[in-house]
Amino acid sequence: MSDFRQDFIRFAVEEQVLRFGEFVTKAGRPSPYFFNAGLFNHGASLLSLARFYARSISESGIAFDMLFGPAYKGIVLAGATAMMLAEQGRDVPFAFNRKEAKDHGEGGTLIGAPLKGRVLIIDDVISAGTSVRESVEIIRANGAEPAGVAIALDRMERGQGELSATQEVAQKFGLPVVAIASLDDLLGFLAGSPDLADNLTRVEAYRTQYGVR
Protein backbone atom coordinates (compact mmCIF):
# COMPACT_ATOMS: atom_id res chain seq x y z
CA MET A 1 0.00 0.00 0.00
CA SER A 2 1.31 3.44 -0.89
CA ASP A 3 2.14 5.38 2.26
CA PHE A 4 0.05 8.42 1.36
CA ARG A 5 -3.03 6.26 0.82
CA GLN A 6 -2.58 4.66 4.23
CA ASP A 7 -1.98 8.11 5.69
CA PHE A 8 -5.26 9.27 4.15
CA ILE A 9 -7.25 6.41 5.70
CA ARG A 10 -5.66 7.12 9.09
CA PHE A 11 -6.41 10.83 8.69
CA ALA A 12 -10.06 10.12 7.82
CA VAL A 13 -10.43 7.87 10.88
CA GLU A 14 -8.83 10.46 13.18
CA GLU A 15 -11.17 13.16 11.85
CA GLN A 16 -14.15 10.77 12.33
CA VAL A 17 -14.93 11.18 8.65
CA LEU A 18 -14.47 7.42 8.31
CA ARG A 19 -16.36 5.58 11.04
CA PHE A 20 -17.09 1.97 11.86
CA GLY A 21 -20.37 0.56 13.18
CA GLU A 22 -23.77 -0.19 11.65
CA PHE A 23 -24.82 2.05 8.78
CA VAL A 24 -27.09 1.94 5.73
CA THR A 25 -25.71 3.08 2.36
CA LYS A 26 -27.55 5.21 -0.19
CA ALA A 27 -28.28 1.95 -2.03
CA GLY A 28 -29.97 0.56 1.10
CA ARG A 29 -27.19 -1.87 1.97
CA PRO A 30 -26.17 -2.45 5.60
CA SER A 31 -22.54 -1.31 5.84
CA PRO A 32 -19.92 -1.74 8.60
CA TYR A 33 -18.32 1.60 7.74
CA PHE A 34 -19.37 5.08 6.68
CA PHE A 35 -17.40 7.83 4.92
CA ASN A 36 -18.70 11.40 5.08
CA ALA A 37 -16.36 13.95 3.49
CA GLY A 38 -18.63 16.75 4.72
CA LEU A 39 -17.01 16.27 8.13
CA PHE A 40 -13.73 17.69 6.84
CA ASN A 41 -15.20 20.92 8.12
CA HIS A 42 -12.40 23.03 9.56
CA GLY A 43 -9.41 24.76 8.05
CA ALA A 44 -6.67 22.34 9.06
CA SER A 45 -8.53 19.22 7.92
CA LEU A 46 -9.51 20.83 4.60
CA LEU A 47 -5.89 21.83 4.03
CA SER A 48 -4.74 18.25 4.60
CA LEU A 49 -7.53 16.88 2.40
CA ALA A 50 -6.54 19.21 -0.44
CA ARG A 51 -2.95 18.03 -0.10
CA PHE A 52 -4.08 14.41 -0.53
CA TYR A 53 -6.20 15.32 -3.58
CA ALA A 54 -3.32 17.23 -5.16
CA ARG A 55 -0.93 14.32 -4.71
CA SER A 56 -3.42 11.76 -6.01
CA ILE A 57 -4.15 13.89 -9.08
CA SER A 58 -0.48 14.59 -9.77
CA GLU A 59 0.46 10.91 -9.51
CA SER A 60 -2.44 9.84 -11.76
CA GLY A 61 -0.85 11.39 -14.83
CA ILE A 62 -4.25 12.66 -16.07
CA ALA A 63 -3.76 15.62 -18.41
CA PHE A 64 -6.09 18.50 -17.52
CA ASP A 65 -6.36 22.26 -17.85
CA MET A 66 -8.75 23.13 -15.02
CA LEU A 67 -10.91 21.75 -12.19
CA PHE A 68 -14.70 21.54 -11.92
CA GLY A 69 -16.49 20.92 -8.62
CA PRO A 70 -20.13 19.82 -8.81
CA ALA A 71 -22.45 21.32 -6.20
CA TYR A 72 -22.33 21.03 -3.33
CA LYS A 73 -19.35 19.16 -1.83
CA GLY A 74 -17.32 19.52 -5.01
CA ILE A 75 -17.36 23.31 -4.70
CA VAL A 76 -15.07 23.39 -1.67
CA LEU A 77 -12.98 20.48 -2.95
CA ALA A 78 -12.25 22.17 -6.29
CA GLY A 79 -11.28 25.48 -4.69
CA ALA A 80 -9.11 23.93 -1.98
CA THR A 81 -7.36 21.58 -4.41
CA ALA A 82 -6.68 24.42 -6.86
CA MET A 83 -5.04 26.35 -4.01
CA MET A 84 -2.87 23.37 -3.07
CA LEU A 85 -1.83 22.75 -6.68
CA ALA A 86 -0.89 26.44 -6.96
CA GLU A 87 1.19 26.19 -3.80
CA GLN A 88 2.99 23.26 -5.41
CA GLY A 89 3.75 25.26 -8.55
CA ARG A 90 0.79 24.49 -10.82
CA ASP A 91 -1.75 27.30 -11.06
CA VAL A 92 -4.97 26.03 -12.67
CA PRO A 93 -8.39 27.71 -12.90
CA PHE A 94 -11.48 26.18 -11.34
CA ALA A 95 -15.24 26.47 -11.64
CA PHE A 96 -18.36 25.06 -10.03
CA ASN A 97 -22.09 25.07 -10.56
CA ARG A 98 -25.20 26.11 -8.71
CA LYS A 99 -28.11 23.73 -8.26
CA GLU A 100 -30.50 26.56 -9.14
CA ALA A 101 -29.96 29.14 -11.88
CA LYS A 102 -29.53 32.76 -10.75
CA ASP A 103 -31.46 35.39 -12.73
CA HIS A 104 -29.62 38.47 -11.40
CA GLY A 105 -26.03 39.60 -10.92
CA GLU A 106 -23.73 37.35 -12.93
CA GLY A 107 -26.68 35.00 -13.54
CA GLY A 108 -26.62 31.43 -14.79
CA THR A 109 -25.54 28.26 -13.03
CA LEU A 110 -21.74 28.46 -13.42
CA ILE A 111 -19.34 30.34 -11.15
CA GLY A 112 -15.60 30.73 -11.55
CA ALA A 113 -13.37 30.41 -14.59
CA PRO A 114 -14.90 29.73 -18.02
CA LEU A 115 -14.95 26.03 -18.85
CA LYS A 116 -12.19 25.50 -21.41
CA GLY A 117 -9.93 22.69 -22.54
CA ARG A 118 -9.68 19.47 -20.55
CA VAL A 119 -11.67 19.66 -17.32
CA LEU A 120 -11.03 17.39 -14.32
CA ILE A 121 -14.14 16.77 -12.22
CA ILE A 122 -13.48 16.62 -8.47
CA ASP A 123 -15.94 15.17 -5.95
CA ASP A 124 -15.94 13.18 -2.70
CA VAL A 125 -17.27 9.78 -3.82
CA ILE A 126 -19.18 8.21 -6.71
CA SER A 127 -22.49 6.67 -5.66
CA ALA A 128 -25.04 6.45 -8.47
CA GLY A 129 -22.92 8.50 -10.88
CA THR A 130 -25.58 11.21 -11.17
CA SER A 131 -23.19 14.02 -10.22
CA VAL A 132 -20.62 12.88 -12.79
CA ARG A 133 -23.24 12.63 -15.54
CA GLU A 134 -24.51 16.14 -14.81
CA SER A 135 -20.95 17.48 -14.71
CA VAL A 136 -20.08 15.89 -18.05
CA GLU A 137 -23.19 17.43 -19.61
CA ILE A 138 -22.32 20.90 -18.23
CA ILE A 139 -18.71 20.70 -19.39
CA ARG A 140 -19.59 19.56 -22.91
CA ALA A 141 -22.42 22.09 -23.21
CA ASN A 142 -19.82 24.81 -22.64
CA GLY A 143 -17.52 23.55 -25.38
CA ALA A 144 -14.97 21.90 -23.08
CA GLU A 145 -14.03 18.25 -22.65
CA PRO A 146 -14.11 16.19 -19.44
CA ALA A 147 -10.64 14.80 -18.64
CA GLY A 148 -11.45 12.47 -15.75
CA VAL A 149 -12.84 12.26 -12.24
CA ALA A 150 -10.94 12.60 -8.95
CA ILE A 151 -12.58 11.31 -5.75
CA ALA A 152 -11.53 10.70 -2.15
CA LEU A 153 -12.65 7.09 -1.60
CA ASP A 154 -13.54 4.28 -4.00
CA ARG A 155 -15.82 1.89 -2.10
CA MET A 156 -15.26 -0.76 -4.80
CA GLU A 157 -18.79 -2.15 -4.50
CA ARG A 158 -21.21 -3.16 -7.20
CA GLY A 159 -23.48 -0.54 -8.67
CA GLN A 160 -26.48 -1.44 -10.85
CA GLY A 161 -24.81 -4.55 -12.28
CA GLU A 162 -21.57 -6.41 -11.74
CA LEU A 163 -19.38 -3.32 -12.08
CA SER A 164 -18.65 -0.89 -9.28
CA ALA A 165 -20.14 2.60 -9.48
CA THR A 166 -16.65 3.85 -10.32
CA GLN A 167 -16.20 1.26 -13.07
CA GLU A 168 -19.64 2.09 -14.47
CA VAL A 169 -18.69 5.77 -14.75
CA ALA A 170 -15.37 4.92 -16.39
CA GLN A 171 -17.10 2.63 -18.89
CA LYS A 172 -20.08 4.86 -19.65
CA PHE A 173 -18.17 8.11 -20.15
CA GLY A 174 -14.76 6.74 -21.13
CA LEU A 175 -13.11 8.73 -18.35
CA PRO A 176 -10.31 7.72 -15.99
CA VAL A 177 -11.30 7.79 -12.31
CA VAL A 178 -8.62 8.35 -9.69
CA ALA A 179 -9.25 7.90 -5.96
CA ILE A 180 -7.03 8.97 -3.08
CA ALA A 181 -7.77 5.59 -1.47
CA SER A 182 -9.94 2.53 -2.06
CA LEU A 183 -11.57 -0.28 -0.11
CA ASP A 184 -8.37 -2.29 -0.64
CA ASP A 185 -6.43 0.46 1.13
CA LEU A 186 -8.97 0.49 3.96
CA LEU A 187 -8.65 -3.28 4.43
CA GLY A 188 -4.86 -3.00 4.44
CA PHE A 189 -5.04 -0.25 7.05
CA LEU A 190 -7.34 -2.31 9.29
CA ALA A 191 -5.08 -5.34 8.99
CA GLY A 192 -2.20 -3.25 10.33
CA SER A 193 -4.17 -1.52 13.10
CA PRO A 194 -4.60 -3.77 16.18
CA ASP A 195 -6.95 -1.27 17.87
CA LEU A 196 -9.33 -1.48 14.89
CA ALA A 197 -8.80 -5.15 14.01
CA ASP A 198 -12.27 -6.17 15.19
CA ASN A 199 -13.68 -4.25 12.20
CA LEU A 200 -11.57 -6.14 9.66
CA THR A 201 -13.72 -9.28 9.53
CA ARG A 202 -16.93 -7.28 9.07
CA VAL A 203 -15.49 -5.10 6.29
CA GLU A 204 -14.07 -8.19 4.56
CA ALA A 205 -17.51 -9.85 4.74
CA TYR A 206 -19.08 -6.73 3.23
CA ARG A 207 -16.51 -6.79 0.45
CA THR A 208 -17.27 -10.46 -0.24
CA GLN A 209 -21.01 -9.79 -0.47
CA TYR A 210 -21.09 -6.49 -2.36
CA GLY A 211 -17.60 -5.81 -3.67
CA VAL A 212 -15.87 -6.13 -7.01
CA ARG A 213 -12.35 -7.36 -7.66
From Swiss-Prot:
Domain of life: Bacteria
Required cofactor names: Mg(2+)
Pfam families xref list: Pribosyltran
Catalytic reaction equation(s): orotidine 5'-phosphate + diphosphate = orotate + 5-phospho-alpha-D-ribose 1-diphosphate
Binding-site residues, orotate: F34, F35, S127, R155
Alphabetized Gene3D superfamilies for the sequence: 3.40.50.2020
Biological or metabolic pathway of the protein: Pyrimidine metabolism; UMP biosynthesis via de novo pathway; UMP from orotate: step 1/2
Example of a GO MF term: orotate phosphoribosyltransferase activity
Listed GO biological process terms: 'de novo' pyrimidine nucleobase biosynthetic process; 'de novo' UMP biosynthetic process; pyrimidine ribonucleoside biosynthetic process
Residues engaged in binding 5-phospho-alpha-D-ribose 1-diphosphate: 26, 72-73, 98-99, 102, 104, 123-131
CDD domains associated with the record: PRTases_typeI
UniProt EC number: 2.4.2.10
HAMAP family xrefs: PyrE
Role: Catalyzes the transfer of a ribosyl phosphate group from 5-phosphoribose 1-diphosphate to orotate, leading to the formation of orotidine monophosphate (OMP).
Subunit architecture: Homodimer.
The protein's name: Orotate phosphoribosyltransferase
Gene name in the database record: pyrE
